[in-house]
Amino acid sequence: MPALNTDEFMEGKTVEYVKLANGVEIPKIGYGVFQISKDDAPRCVREAIETGYRHIDTAQSYFNEAEVGQGIKDSGIDRKDLFLTTKIWISNYGYENTLRSVDVSLKKLGTDYLDLVLLHQPFSDTYGAWRALEKLYKDGVIRAIGVSNFYPDRLADMVAFNEIAPMVDQDRKSVV
């Protein structure tokens, strides 16, 4: 994978944020690591941070969380200055499975909290998984919770039948 052109991309630009319903601020643009190999992920993440990205978006199903964590560590950035998102894969849904899988993600990413955790797909035991995310949110382990790739009717169900509504409905957009 080619190196980022750090001289041009974010030169002189400031990071813009959006405030979520719970008051947490998320950078408008994030650096997604889907399909970045384990070999390339540490360098790519470090270079993205050096370039000015302040939101790193990963997922359990990308199989590179540990390498993303290494890239964050290598960058030397203070954790408080970075917004970190991961997504729970459907094989880790269900209350207990989700609690365990978030703990594994925390360890792989080398952090004691996550800024945003999303349910990656609208299949399997989404309600059990969501209740686990609600608990982790209330416990302060996760700063915001949401969904990704959910159909409008499934999103409406998540709002109607849970204590805490999703704070984010992620829809993939690429700038390149």
Could you tell me what each predicted segment is?
Residues 98-118, 135-139:
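CE4/NodB-like, metal-dependent polysaccharide N-deacetylase domain
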Residues 74-81, 109-111, 137-141, 162-165:
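Short helix-capping segments at alpha-helix termini
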